Design a protein with these regions (language model features):
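Extracellular/periplasmic, surface-exposed regions of secreted and cell-surface proteins
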Residues: 1-188
Length: 188
């Protein structure tokens, strides 16, 4: 694959990162083999912009950052999915090979793609000893690669294909506190 990234930072106040990845896979048919997935991430440290927030006299509210990101992630098919299941047949006296026609792959199988985004805030209190991180996220996965049972009249029993979408979202909250913090030891 090929990966590229561009980063920008303005005096530690704002940051932006844009990435792109182009992958080729041998586990999908040639026309669906290449796929691209990008991402963008950014953040703004508001505490650097608000007068008095980083003042050493104001240690009860010491840091505030807003952040967000969006990304796509690709996933290809498992290895050997398109081989027709030839294998050794050990019960024949001289060995041999067998063909197992009970498994099929949809020939229009495409990569599974997930798209996600997240927004969050990072707040620190009491000279950074108490930290609160709150984020909301959403993930949508399309073209899931699954193996399903099909009617025997199709000529096989199982087929792998792109089937369905899944969406999930939620809130993540993290609260951390430094109980003891000195030059020799930190207990969080």
């Amino acid at each position: 694959g090929v990966f590229g990234e561009v980063r920008a930072d303005y005096k530690g106040l704002a940051s932006l990162s844009v990435t792109g990845r182009w992958d080729w896979t041998s586990t999908l048919l040639y026309e669906y083999s290449p796929y691209f997935y990008p991402s963008i991430t950014g953040g703004v440290t508001l505490s650097e912009l608000i007068p008095g927030m980083t003042d050493t006299k104001n240690d009860w509210f010491s840091y505030l950052k807003l952040r967000g990101n969006w990304a796509m992630v690709g996933k290809d098919a498992p290895a050997y999915l398109f081989d027709r299941r030839f294998g050794q047949y050990p019960t024949l006296p001289d060995g041999g090979y067998s063909y197992n026609p009970s498994f099929s792959t949809g020939f229009n199988l495409r990569p599974e793609m997930s798209s996600s985004w997240e927004v969050g805030v990072d707040v620190r209190f009491f000279a950074g000893r108490t930290r609160l991180d709150v984020a909301y996220y959403s993930i949508q996965t399309n073209n899931q690669i699954v193996t399903v049972r099909v009617p025997v009249t199709a000529g096989y029993v199982l087929q792998t294909r792109n089937e369905g979408s899944v969406k999930n979202h939620g809130v993540e909250i993290s609260l951390e506190q430094d109980i003891i913090k000195n030059s020799d030891w930190t207990w969080t």
